[in-house]
Amino acid sequence: MAFHCQRDCYATELLTEVVSCHPAQLKLENGGKKNTVSGFNVLLKDTVLFPEGGGQPDDRGFIGEVPVLRVIRQGPDAVHFVASPLDPATEVLVKIDWNRRFDHMQQHSGQHLVTAIADSLYGFKTTSWDLGRQRSVIELDTPLVTAEQVEAIEKVANQKIREHVPVHVRLITVDDPEFDMVRSRGLPDDHAGPVRIIDIEGVDANMCCGTHVRNLSDLQMIKILGTEKGKKNKTNLIFLSGERVLKYVSRSYNTEKTLTSLLKNGPEEHIEAVDKLQKSVKALQKNNLTLLRDLAVLTAENFKSKADRGKFFSLHRKEGDNEFMNIIANEIGTEDTLLFLTIGDEKTSGLFLLAGPPGIVEKFGPRVCEILDGKGAGKCGRFQGKANKMSQRAEVEVLLQKVISSVEITQE
């Protein structure tokens, strides 16, 4: 049985009845991480909310006043995951997030159109696709799609949109002769009942459970951004449909305006200007590295030139890297001197190096790391890593001064 959202993809609400409600848990993404959330699985007599399937993400919306967090298909049922319980046999009004739904419809129907044209023009078969949050990707079974072919596919797709081609939804049985003629990647193992066909009139007929536009004119436009190398002998075609094209143009124009202001030139000169800046930065970084190395050597020589230099050397700099610290350690020598070197912000995070007699470093390296709330490792008289509490540096110095006072280090 098809859900109401599949029979009428443009319906935004539906009065229906709660069949069941059971406690459940589900992993939901929040801030890029998946966390297990407790809630309830709700079954309805029918639903206007599309459950995830056919490469299309699920809908969002409300059952009464209760937000629907996920909709998942389980066999013939659409399971609605919600945070609050709903009473069975209760009549409820189900509403969808139309902006999300229509976006998915535009991308999904756009994929059908691009897939059909790529096949009819060049015999490129679609092996999979992904409806992403920002852009969608069609995986084509070919190692190469040329720029000319991309342009031709896009041109024909937009021509069909301008021709106002109708899109029909039909249901057929698996024993219907047409079943073996339509494009398909197979039915789910738990599929039952009629097979749903999305028919773009005169262009394509394809098995699909997703929601689609009723006319290609509702796609507004299609823009193929380009291609990327896919899996072995496959090419990924990146595209946008409908409102996503308008949003992409708006973002691109705002970026162009910002770059024009920053670079003090016109859009046609942006690439050349950025290229010059990158080369200048690379040259400056190279010069800076040379100066840091020279500074490391001079710092070490200055310490060694002091008659009363002692057996402990401590230094902190905001600028530098691991190489800077290791050059100092190499130049001073660690057989008769204990060195504590740090790089970075004095109050937050940075890098550290403890170098000296292996016995001392091996014993106190982990303690230094602990005080600095860092992570690191050591061998051969050196313990280095990253520190999260550089503000604790003074505490480390006190500890190491006590170590020097209590442990005899042979000095030339």
Swiss-Prot record:
Pfam families hit by this protein: tRNA_SAD (PF07973)
Residues the entry annotates as binding Zn(2+): 108, 112, 208, 212
Cofactor(s) annotated in UniProt: Zn(2+)
Cofactor note: Binds 1 zinc ion per subunit.
The keyword Cell inner membrane belongs to this UniProt entry's keyword annotation: no
Annotated GO biological process: alanyl-tRNA aminoacylation; regulation of translational fidelity
SMART domains: tRNA_SAD
GO MF term list: alanine-tRNA ligase activity; ATP binding; metal ion binding; nucleic acid binding; Ser-tRNA(Ala) deacylase activity
InterPro entries attached to this UniProt entry: Ala-tRNA-synth_IIc_core (IPR018165), Alanyl-tRNA_Editing_Enzymes (IPR051335), Thr/Ala-tRNA-synth_IIc_edit (IPR018163), Transl_B-barrel_sf (IPR009000), tRNA_SAD (IPR012947)
Keyword Transmembrane recorded: no
Gene3D superfamilies recorded: 2.40.30.130, Threonyl-trna Synthetase, Chain A, domain 2
A GO term from the CC aspect: cytoplasm
Alphabetical keyword list: Cytoplasm, Metal-binding, Protein biosynthesis, Zinc
Major subcellular site: cytoplasm
Domain of life according to the entry: Eukaryota
Compartments reported by the entry: Cytoplasm
Entry function: Functions in trans to edit the amino acid moiety from incorrectly charged tRNA(Ala).
Family: Belongs to the class-II aminoacyl-tRNA synthetase family. Alax-L subfamily.
Protein name in the entry: Alanyl-tRNA editing protein Aarsd1-B
